[in-house]
């Protein structure tokens, strides 16, 4: 299926799998350079289908089968509208109460979900796998890994403004943690993540706990583990669903079961 965005000439490609009866829904958002048919969203979505949930997986703009305008991403600044469009389709078109809709994001998708969480106060529960807390910190880290001085991060901001007109550092996913209130967040981040260091997840967790109100909840999990992605290369980025498969399934079942009232 395709979603269209108001005031934007964009088509957002999505897959939907509806459960029988009045089941809660979960919206799944992929990472950078990925799409809805990647294991990072397909696997957890399949886990939740087996638990009786309805699910939507969508391709953010410039990814997968969705509209491609300039082959650029904006670190969630614009992509958050794709997430909100998917969420509103479930809420408004399918008539699902807000408290029965969860959102799941991985990597760039996790940061984007956090921005959407800040933008839309009706999003009831969100799972963030390997989120970035601040894009400037990510760019500085990538520059240092590549052997360049961190102050060049300002150039990335300028390039974003020049080519897309968007400040990719304008809003940070920390806004999502700060806006938690009486809502619910689960933050999972691998200790051996070399792409988005674990301190990003820890900062999101600390911030959410500081701003959480009485009826809200924050759960944080920092598993270890890496997988081989080549003859001589390993990665610890967003791999816990593979290295901790049974525990991942259990944690998702418990979190969404509790927060979306689906036991």
PLM-predicted stretches and their roles:
Residues 1-21:
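N-terminal cap/lid segment of alpha/beta-hydrolase-fold proteins
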Residues 194-200:
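Conserved alpha/beta-hydrolase "acid-adjacent" motif
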Residues 115-166:
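Hydrolase active-site cap/lid region
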Residues 95-106:
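Alpha/beta-hydrolase fold nucleophile elbow
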Residues 202, 210-263:
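C-terminal catalytic histidine-bearing segment of alpha/beta-hydrolase fold enzymes
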């Amino acid at each position: 299926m395709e979603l269209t965005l108001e005031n934007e000439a964009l088509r957002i490609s999505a897959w939907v799998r509806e459960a029988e009866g009045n089941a809660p829904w979960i919206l799944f958002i992929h990472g950078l350079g990925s799409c809805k048919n990647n294991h990072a969203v397909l696997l957890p979505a399949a886990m939740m289908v087996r638990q009786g949930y309805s699910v939507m997986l969508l391709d953010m703009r410039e990814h997968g089968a969705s509209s491609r305008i300039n082959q650029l991403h904006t670190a969630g600044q614009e992509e958050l509208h794709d997430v909100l469009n998917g969420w509103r389709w479930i809420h408004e078109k399918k008539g699902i109460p807000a408290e029965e809709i969860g959102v799941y994001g991985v990597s760039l998708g996790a940061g984007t979900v956090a921005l959407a969480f800040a933008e839309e106060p009706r999003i009831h529960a969100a799972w963030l796998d390997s989120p970035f807390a601040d894009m400037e910190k990510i760019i500085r880290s990538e520059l240092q890994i590549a052997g360049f001085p961190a102050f060049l991060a300002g150039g990335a901001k300028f390039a974003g403004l020049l080519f897309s007109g968007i400040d990719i550092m304008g809003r940070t996913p920390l806004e999502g943690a700060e806006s938690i209130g009486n809502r619910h967040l689960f933050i999972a981040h691998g200790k051996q993540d070399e792409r988005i260091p674990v301190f990003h997840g820890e900062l999101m967790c600390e911030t959410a706990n500081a701003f959480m109100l009485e009826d809200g909840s924050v759960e944080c999990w920092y598993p270890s583990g890496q997988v081989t992605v080549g003859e001589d290369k390993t990665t610890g980025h967003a791999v816990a669903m593979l290295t901790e498969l049974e525990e991942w399934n259990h944690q998702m079942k418990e979190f969404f079961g509790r927060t979306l009232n689906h036991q």
